[in-house]
Structure formats: C-alpha cells, structure tokens
C-alpha cells in the first residue's frame, strides 16, 4: 500500500533531528559546560543538560503541534505568503497565456484539450481562480490513483510540510529566547540557517506544486 505521507517518518523526522542538534550546539550552554566540566560543577552541568533537553523537547513538540493545528488551506496560504495563488488556481490561464514550460507536452496540445474550460473563464480574478481550481480538482479526482500523480503529490506535500515545520521551529525558537533566557541563547547563525532553510523549502514547494498540477492535467 502506498503511504502518501510516509515522508513524515523519514524526511520530516530527519529535519527535526538536524534542527534540534543545531539548537543544542549553538543555542544552549550544554557543550560548553561539558567541555569545562570538573568535580565541582558536575551537578550544574547535569542540570543544564536536563534543562536543555526539556526545552528541546518542548520546541520539538510545539513545532509538531503547530503543524498539526494548521489546516491545509492555511499551509497553502503560508507557502504563497498570503498573496501568491496556488498553481491549480491559474493553470488554465497560464496555458492560455503560454506561461507553462513543461517538456512533457506542447502548449498547443494543451490549448486544444482544454479549450472548453478556457472559454468559460470569467475576467474577474477571484471568480476565475475559483473556477480554475474547481475544474483542475475534477480532473485530479479522475487521475489521483495514477502513479505519476501520487508521486508528484507526495513530493509537493513533503516540501510543504518541511517548510511549515521549519517556519514553526523558527517561531518557537524566537519565543524560547525570551521565555527561557537563562538556558536558550540567541544565535544569529542558527537564525540564518532557519531563514535559509525556510526560503529553500518554500521555493522547492512552489516547484513541486507546479509539477504536481501539470502532471494531473497531462
């Protein structure tokens, strides 16, 4: 059986382990205390390790909880930064305007195949996007069990969830700096890593979403 979200047990888990490792290394005094440990501060070092471990667990759980509480629609809006439309909302307009670049099909063939849909698209932006997405979704329902569609959808959902997890970790880390100032240190390089990962995953999500949408219609 194909597990659409098996990546949550692999890629998402690996990402969380990476972020927690960097958090321990750069944002807590654990490693510094371990390197300078002696008989007189063994207890202090142990206490620091326990505090850092607890806070790491809190950050991890908070990130996962955020991901679970955020709806799929809100995730899509976050990916689009609240102003970029989903690919399914513009796919037929993009074909009509020659903005689709996909080596798997010619634009002229796609124009011929979906002429009926394009002819009934209204000029008003919101209504047009709603109709385009509805038409695309009807096509998706017919081919959702197709292997190439399943694979492209999995890739898209994986990148989207990696982006959301990184964004959630970024937010809870910033909060933890203010909530646990005695244990959590501000690290500019960790913040940069989180920002870079967020941007990279966002770009990947858009690329995979576009690939998924065009795979459905062809």
What kind of feature is each model-predicted range?
Residues 121-123, 195-198:
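Short, charged low-complexity linear motifs
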Residues 54-70, 163, 167, 171, ...:
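Hydrophobic, lipid-facing residues on alpha-helical transmembrane segments of integral membrane proteins
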Residues 21-23, 133, 215:
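Intrinsically disordered regions, especially transient/low-confidence alpha-helical propensity segments
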Residues 73-147:
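Charge-rich cytosolic interhelical loops and cytosolic tails of multi-pass membrane proteins
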Residues 5-21, 140-188:
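Transmembrane alpha-helical segments and their cytosolic interface motifs
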Residues 1-100, 185-192:
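N-terminal first transmembrane alpha-helix
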Residues 1-12, 185, 199-218:
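Cytosolic/matrix-facing juxtamembrane and C-terminal tails of multi-pass cellular membrane proteins
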